[in-house]
Swiss-Prot record:
InterPro entries: Aldolase_TIM, His_biosynth, HisA_bact_arch, Isoase_HisA-like, Isoase_HisA-like_bact, RibuloseP-bd_barrel. It comes from Cereibacter sphaeroides (strain ATCC 17025 / ATH 2.4.3). Its EC number is 5.3.1.16. This is 1-(5-phosphoribosyl)-5-[(5-phosphoribosylamino)methylideneamino] imidazole-4-carboxamide isomerase. Pathway: Amino-acid biosynthesis; L-histidine biosynthesis; L-histidine from 5-phospho-alpha-D-ribose 1-diphosphate: step 4/9. GO terms for cellular component: cytoplasm. The lineage of its organism: Bacteria, Pseudomonadati, Pseudomonadota, Alphaproteobacteria, Rhodobacterales. It catalyses: 1-(5-phospho-beta-D-ribosyl)-5-[(5-phospho-beta-D-ribosylamino)methylideneamino]imidazole-4-carboxamide = 5-[(5-phospho-1-deoxy-D-ribulos-1-ylimino)methylamino]-1-(5-phospho-beta-D-ribosyl)imidazole-4-carboxamide. Keywords: Amino-acid biosynthesis, Cytoplasm, Histidine biosynthesis, Isomerase. It is found in: Cytoplasm.
Amino acid sequence: MILYPAIDLKDGQCVRLLRGEMEAATVFGDDPAAQAAAFEAAGCEWLHLVDLNGAFAGHPVNGAAVEAILARLTVPAQLGGGIRDMKTIALWLEKGLARVILGTVAVENPALVREAARAFPGRVAVGIDARKGRVATKGWATETDVMATDLARSFEDAGVAALIYTDIDRDGAMAGPNIEATDALARAVSIPVIASGGVSSLADLVALRDTGRIAGAISGRALYDGALDLAEALRTLRA
């Protein structure tokens, strides 16, 4: 199982939100590129980036910060937030991102996801952000009647590289991931599932890994708070 350290970008800074609330942002640093380099130095295999302003605006906002990160990295990175058309997808992939994450458009324009997955094989993931099993869009500000499992299954034949499943109520809360819901999603599809939201300890990571079905886990606040040591976590997952 791959551990993805997270860098969430708001106004060019590294932040973490609590349950997706922009006004509940905690700033952890003003040099995202330096933070990315530190994660890479600790041995991470991938990095998970989110343009929080972009998720609400519907277009990239923290582009300069993302480009600065990419200039420092040698490991692959994936980005979500405000990526809602083919032009933006192509632009980010050309700039060096390994993978883009499509969330809102996966609900509103699933044909775009399929088109992108065909055009860029292995480089398009779907972000499924859910509250009590129902998908939320537009930076989690809009709740839908779409069930997370139904959305995941609808892309089974689309060729997407991964599904990133976020339990919104756990995100940033340091309350542990929703292992049951994430594992259920992983059982429901053949697409690799990456868990996000609530990972707060080494025990959480081990529990996710031990399902035998979850391909990856994203952690942010626990790494910044020191509750999770990245080097130790990576050693444990590779053992």
